[in-house]
């Protein structure tokens, strides 16, 4: 009977150990499950954070690209201009020219007055001689014009002399016509008076023309 009791106790001890192991195993299982869940959650969080980081990075890069090209082009242009200063010298030094111009303008305003020679009697005499030389041709021209008129005076005199001849001829013809029609001798008084008037007019015109020519020569 004692052997049976000992066997029963041994069996109970084995059962207790098995239960403990099972309990321990269950705890391990639960612990392992908890650990697995925690790891999965951490992995999910890590994945979420990585995705958000990539999205933010792409958006920031796109914004940077949209804003950066003008600045980069300006930088490139500035580097090109510094590398090649002979391309646009006026564009590179506008401020220098603007600052130098005020200093140059007073010098330019002062230089003409300083460089101009003072007027001397010699220069005034030269100017007066030049004015006289320029005035003499005009006077000579004015003098030559009356000579042309004096040359034309004989023609005018001839033209003035021609009408009296025509008038005397007409008067003679009229007298001959009267003689033939009346058969009487015409009175010569009218003819002589007409011819005398014409000759007087001719003398007056001839005397007036030389006086006009002399007055023009004197002028």
Swiss-Prot record:
Stretches of the chain found on the membrane's Intravirion side: 1-30
Localization, UniProt: Host membrane; Virion
One GO CC term on file: host cell membrane
Region (Disordered): 58-219
Glycosylated residues (UniProt): 52
GO biological process: symbiont entry into host cell; symbiont-mediated suppression of host cytoplasmic pattern recognition receptor signaling pathway via inhibition of RIG-I activity; virion attachment to host cell
Positions on the Virion surface side per record topology: 52-219
Pfam families the record matches: Metaviral_G
Keyword Glycoprotein part of the UniProt annotation: yes
Residue stretches spanning the membrane: 31-51
Bias (Polar residues) ranges: 76-142, 149-164, 206-219
Lipid bilayer topology: Single-pass type I membrane protein
Keyword DNA repair appears in the UniProt entry: no
Keyword annotations from UniProtKB, A to Z: Glycoprotein, Host membrane, Host-virus interaction, Inhibition of host innate immune response by virus, Inhibition of host RIG-I by virus, Inhibition of host RLR pathway by virus, Membrane, Signal-anchor, Transmembrane, Transmembrane helix, Viral attachment to host cell, Viral immunoevasion, Virion, Virus entry into host cell
Low complexity: bias regions: 165-178, 187-199
Entry superkingdom: Viruses
Function: Attaches the virion to the host cell membrane by interacting with glycosaminoglycans, initiating the infection. Unlike other paramyxovirus attachment proteins, lacks both neuraminidase and hemagglutinating activities. In addition to its role in attachment, glycoprotein G interacts with host RIGI and inhibits RIGI-mediated signaling pathway in order to prevent the establishment of the antiviral state.
Subunit-structure text: Homooligomer. Interacts (via N-terminus) with protein M. Interacts with protein F; this interaction occurs on the surface of infected cells. Interacts with protein SH. Interacts with host RIGI; this interaction inhibits host immune response.
Family statement drawn from the similarity comment of this UniProt entry: Belongs to the metapneumoviruses glycoprotein G family.
Name of the protein: Major surface glycoprotein G
Species per Swiss-Prot/TrEMBL record: Human metapneumovirus (strain CAN97-83)
Gene: G
